[in-house]
């Protein structure tokens, strides 16, 4: 059994008397990526800021390596990549890394060896003298990750680290993150990107400051009490409202030239097909495999209602 590294229990947070987080419960193990998935304002960043001691909870407990998250002794065991990366634009790539190495008390020789290794792993070798403010988004991301890893943390908190970077940089970033996970580091990863959520070991779906569902991506798909079908035909969007009123239909979302329809399990595919023909004879329906994006969208819409 892997060690528990991050533990949140009945965690609440409020700002200026406004409740932001409600009864957050989650556990992250060594060598695991836990994805906090939700839209802007759902509470992802607040959880990370609580985890690194920038904010204090109103109620509940948040433990990192069995210590209170606000305990300063944790400073050298954790790494935090905030939105915007938190780099120093007037310092060079080398100077940024040296600053963070010094911040965590690495001896000069050890820091030099580690920085050289991370420059190579992140593809920044040859850019040591370039100012942080002159880097592209993808290179800033690589530098931020290198700075976060320079002291070999046991825990990482990443706040939407791939926002605004190109697909190739995102892929390279995830290759590095997979290596970090393999080294046994526990990672709490905030994202609104469903493709990234699929790569996490487990995810927690956040809505309005609450975790409304959590588990592996496969479990979240399997836990649904409805099933997904795809409806196609000419002018499909024209029939959306009528289809939503059919027996057994829970939700209907237009996706391109088709309609994704969630059906209650009590509604058979054949009975829905017959009802559909009453709407328009040219409409066809077939089973569809739900993705994490599909079930997340369903959960969020149902929660809002």
Q: Which role fits each region the language model picked out?
A:
Residues 52:
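Helix-to-loop junction immediately C-terminal to a conserved catalytic motif
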Residues 60-74:
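Conserved ABC transporter NBD signature motif
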Residues 98, 102, 109-127:
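Conserved ABC ATPase "signature" region
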Residues 131-135:
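Conserved ABC ATPase signature
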Residues 156-160:
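Catalytic Walker B motif of ABC-type/P-loop ATPase nucleotide-binding domains
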């Amino acid at each position: 059994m892997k060690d528990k590294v991050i533990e949140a229990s009945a965690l609440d947070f409020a700002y200026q008397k406004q409740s932001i987080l409600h009864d957050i419960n989650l556990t992250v193990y060594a060598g695991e990526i836990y994805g906090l998935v939700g839209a802007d304002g759902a509470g992802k960043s607040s959880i990370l800021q609580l985890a690194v001691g920038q904010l204090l909870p109103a109620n509940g407990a948040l433990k990192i390596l069995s210590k209170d998250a606000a305990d300063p002794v944790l400073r050298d065991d954790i790494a935090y990549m905030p939105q915007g990366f938190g780099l120093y634009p007037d310092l060079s790539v080398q100077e940024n890394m040296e600053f963070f190495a010094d911040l965590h008390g690495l001896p000069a020789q050890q820091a030099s060896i580690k920085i050289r290794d991370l420059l190579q792993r992140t593809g920044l070798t040859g850019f040591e003298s370039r100012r942080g403010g002159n880097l592209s988004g993808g290179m800033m991301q690589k530098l931020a990750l290198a700075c976060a890893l320079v002291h070999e943390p046991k825990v990482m908190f990443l706040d939407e680290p791939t926002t605004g970077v190109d697909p190739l940089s995102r892929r390279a970033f995830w290759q590095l993150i997979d290596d970090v996970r393999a080294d046994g580091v526990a990672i709490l990863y905030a994202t609104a990107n469903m493709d990234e959520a699929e790569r996490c070991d487990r995810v927690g779906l956040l809505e309005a400051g609450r975790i409304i569902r959590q588990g592996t991506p496969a479990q979240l798909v399997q836990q649904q009490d409805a099933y997904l079908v795809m409806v196609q035909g000419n002018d499909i969007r024209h029939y959306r409202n009528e289809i939503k009123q059919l027996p057994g239909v829970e939700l209907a979302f237009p996706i391109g030239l088709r309609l994704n329809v969630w059906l209650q399990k009590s509604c058979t595919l054949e009975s829905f097909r017959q009802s559909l023909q009453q709407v328009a004879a040219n409409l066809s329906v077939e089973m569809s495999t739900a993705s994490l994006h599909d079930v997340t969208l369903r959960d969020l819409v149902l929660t809002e209602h």
